[in-house]
């Protein structure tokens, strides 16, 4: 399907610009944007992995739900989260990317600990679902627009490596280790420390959101390097 799609006008224009500079060398001209990708991704990917991959273990090991209950709750929450994505994307088209990211950051810092603490002590699948759904209403401020925000940071002809390299490294470090960090704290008898860790990661990203430009209003998507 990808091979039959038409390229965008910006990409076709970029193909006309022939340069011998390597992609990595070109990327070195954008250190600020690379750091922005890392900063805006760290908290969001940690939160995303918490409420997707780790949540199944959390519901079984900490909440005490059965396998069937865990499956129903996590699947229902994922469907709810999927529904939110285009809605939040539409909101960002109206108010800008930055404000939606800031909303995620502020709400994540304020409500991550209360949500996870309450979730740990619920007694059934329905309240568990409602709490995870509330978390998705926060996390979707990041997940719904993170890809387009990163794309809007870089000119067309280096966008793939500009987004892909720092994003992949950040997801591996902060997203891929979520389960290990959470279970590590649990094995030490301090499971709640993970809640503070996650809040701290979101807080770091919030600082980035506060000082970055709104990429909807100032996009590099149609520029050439």
Spans of features found by a protein language model:
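Multi-pass alpha-helical transporter architecture, strongest
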Residues: 2-3, 149, 200-225
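Cytoplasmic membrane-interface "Motif A"-like loop-to-helix N-cap segments
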Residues: 94-105
């Amino acid at each position: 399907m990808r091979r039959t799609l038409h390229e965008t006008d910006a990409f076709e224009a970029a193909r006309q610009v022939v340069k011998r500079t390597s992609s990595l060398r070109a990327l070195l001209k954008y250190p600020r944007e690379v750091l922005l990708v890392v900063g805006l991704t760290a908290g969001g990917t940690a939160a995303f992995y918490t409420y997707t991959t780790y949540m199944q273990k959390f519901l079984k090991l900490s909440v005490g739900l059965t396998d069937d209950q865990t499956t129903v709750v996590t699947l229902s929450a994922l469907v709810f989260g999927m529904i939110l994505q285009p809605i939040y994307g539409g909101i960002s088209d109206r108010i800008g990317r930055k404000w939606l990211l800031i909303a995620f950051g502020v709400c994540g810092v304020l409500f991550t600990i209360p949500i996870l603490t309450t979730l740990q002590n619920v007694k059934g699948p329905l309240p568990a679902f409602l709490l995870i759904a509330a978390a998705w209403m926060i996390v979707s401020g990041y997940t719904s627009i993170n890809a387009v925000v990163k794309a809007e940071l870089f000119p067309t002809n280096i966008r793939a490596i500009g987004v892909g390299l720092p994003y992949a490294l950040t997801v591996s470090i902060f997203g891929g280790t979520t389960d290990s960090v959470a279970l590590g704290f649990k094995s030490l008898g301090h499971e709640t420390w993970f809640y503070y860790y996650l809040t701290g990661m979101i807080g770091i990203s919030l600082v980035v959101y506060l000082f970055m430009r709104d990429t909807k209003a100032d996009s590099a998507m149609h520029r050439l390097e």
